[in-house]
């Protein structure tokens, strides 16, 4: 297995994984939208995406987005997406992707990584095993824009 930073040139190998990831979260399959979304993130340099491959085949990814902590005066990343293809799960690929993201943050001297997950996501055990701590100091709220785009 190899983990590397993906580029715009990797989009075609990422799209099937990204589309499957969205389907997992009950979104309709739409490879064209997945391709457009990823292409825009890469073009605007808005993400860092680590791609896991086995014998050259893309099998998993994690995607990070940069943000900042005004209190600590340091940047940190939001680990927004983590996905491993069904047939490659339980092989340590998810763990390797998470560890790679942590190493990347250490190298960049970022404050850390934040992630959110569903209450019933079994990966919570993995996150805690790898050093993530459940933040019980804050409540997280989200406002949804219900107006349609023009």
Each predicted region: which residue ranges?
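Short beta-strand-to-coil "C-cap" segments at the C-terminal boundary of structured domains/repeats
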Residues: 142-148
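Acetyl-CoA-dependent GNAT
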Residues: 5-12, 16-74, 80, 135, ...
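Conserved acetyl-CoA-binding loop-helix of GNAT-fold acetyltransferases
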Residues: 84, 90-103, 129
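Conserved active-site alpha-helix within GNAT-family acetyltransferase domains
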Residues: 95, 119-137, 143
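Extreme N-terminal starter segment of soluble prokaryotic enzymes
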Residues: 1-3
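Residue-level recognition of the GNAT/N-acetyltransferase active site
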Residues: 85, 118
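Conserved GNAT acetyl-CoA-binding A-motif
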Residues: 105-116
């Amino acid at each position: 297995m190899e983990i590397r930073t993906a580029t715009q040139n990797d989009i075609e190998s990422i799209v099937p994984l990204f589309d499957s990831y969205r389907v997992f979260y009950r979104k309709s399959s739409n490879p064209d939208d997945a391709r457009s979304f990823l292409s825009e993130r890469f073009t605007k340099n808005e993400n860092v995406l680590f791609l896991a491959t086995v014998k050259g085949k893309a099998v998993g990814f994690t995607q990070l987005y940069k943000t900042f902590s005004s209190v600590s005066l340091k940047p940190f990343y939001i680990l927004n997406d983590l996905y491993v293809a069904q047939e490659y799960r339980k092989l340590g690929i998810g763990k390797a992707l998470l560890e790679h993201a942590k190493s990347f943050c250490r190298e960049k001297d970022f404050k850390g990584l934040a992630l959110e997950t569903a209450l019933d996501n079994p990966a919570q055990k993995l996150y805690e095993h790898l050093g993530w701590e459940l933040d019980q100091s804050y409540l997280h709220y989200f406002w949804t824009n219900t107006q349609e785009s023009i």
